[in-house]
Amino acid sequence: MSELDPSIHQPTRLRILMLLSGVDAADFSFLLNTLAITKGNLSSHMSRLEQAGYVKVVKTFEGKVPNTSYSLTKEGRASLSTYWQALDRIRSARPG
């Protein structure tokens, strides 16, 4: 399993990337409610994914209310695809 990217393989980060892979962008509140995790947990995972170059963070204001949205980068999409391919290889491996 050494070929599985640990930044993706962590269950919560995998769920985040799966959600982002199906949309152009998602805001913090949507991810928070959908994943049912704490704000601190989500912030920590998003920071890790941003540092890996897998997500892009955009901070804006809607009126006076701050809004943070996230989208999958090209590198993030490619890494997620590579991750699935690695899982397929593991799944189809035959003993012996």
What is each of the regions a protein language model found here?
Residues M1, M18, K74, A78-G96:
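Amphipathic alpha-helical dimerization/coiled-coil segments
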Residues S2-T38, T60-S69:
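N-terminal helix-turn-helix DNA-binding core of bacterial DNA-binding proteins
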Residues N41:
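Residues in the helix-turn-helix
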Residues M46-S47:
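Short, hydrophobic-biased segments on the C-terminal half of alpha helices
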Residues G53:
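Glycine-centered, phosphate/nucleic-acid-interacting loop/turn motifs that mediate DNA/RNA or nucleotide
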Residues V57:
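Short beta-strand "wing" residues that participate in macromolecule-binding interfaces
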